[in-house]
Regions:
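Short amphipathic alpha-helical segments and their helix-coil junctions
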Residues: 1, 16-29, 69-70, 139, ...
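Short acidic, Pro/Gly- and aromatic-enriched capping/linker segments at domain boundaries
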Residues: 1-9
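Metal-dependent nuclease catalytic regions and adjoining charged, substrate-binding loops involved
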Residues: 4, 63, 67, 71, ...
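Nuclease catalytic cores
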Residues: 9-52, 106-107
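Short helix-capping/linker segments at secondary-structure and domain boundaries
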Residues: 28, 49-57, 169-173
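A non-catalytic, helix-rich entry segment at domain boundaries
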Residues: 41-115
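Mg2+/Mn2+-dependent nuclease catalytic core
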Residues: 107-174
Length: 174
């Protein structure tokens, strides 16, 4: 089975050789980069935001994982990693405190697109949030950035378009 994700396509468009090393040769870096780690940890906290005790336990688990890393990986993430994560997540909660929680989080999907040389090609991904409304479904997608992205980046983001098509395919509505 050939799995195609938004990340895989983005990697190929950014650098075909990097795509080859990562997805064909299956080589990976020894440790996750700060942006990837930060995004993963932020999403873990998002899933727990409706329950304060689970949120505290989740943050404690992230902290324990950080301190279990090798010294070099801790240096790569930075001394302020845990403080930055907590500060940014607390700011997020203040901004969205009056918003309702999503009906579904971390919705995984695999959609068969066809075959290539007899092998199935599957579009795969994880949708951060789904909100069910009277007028259909709303997709929530969270990204963490070092700098605030400009509107062109936000409008031209293909991930939300692909995920909208996936939701439409899976549910019959959007």
């Amino acid at each position: 089975m050939i799995k195609v994700s938004h990340s895989r396509v983005s990697c190929y468009l950014s650098c075909p050789y990097s795509h080859y090393l990562r997805y064909v040769e299956r080589l990976s870096k020894k440790g996750k980069s700060r942006p990837l780690s930060f995004g993963s940890d932020f999403h873990k906290l998002l899933e727990l935001r409706g329950d304060k005790s689970k949120l505290k336990s989740g943050f404690d688990a992230i902290k324990n994982t950080y301190y279990d890393l090798s010294p070099q990986n801790q240096v790569d993430l930075g001394d302020s990693y845990l403080d930055d994560l907590k500060t940014i997540f607390n700011d997020y909660q203040k901004v969205y405190r009056n918003h309702e929680l999503p009906d579904k989080t971390e919705m995984k999907f695999d959609i068969e697109m066809g075959k290539y040389h007899g092998e199935s090609v599957v579009f795969t991904g994880i949708i951060d949030e789904l909100y069910e409304t009277e007028n259909g479904l709303i997709i929530g997608e969270h990204k963490t950035f070092t700098r605030r992205p400009d509107m062109l980046f936000i409008v031209m983001n293909t991930q939300k378009c692909l995920y909208a098509k996936a939701v439409q395919f899976l549910t019959g509505s959007l």
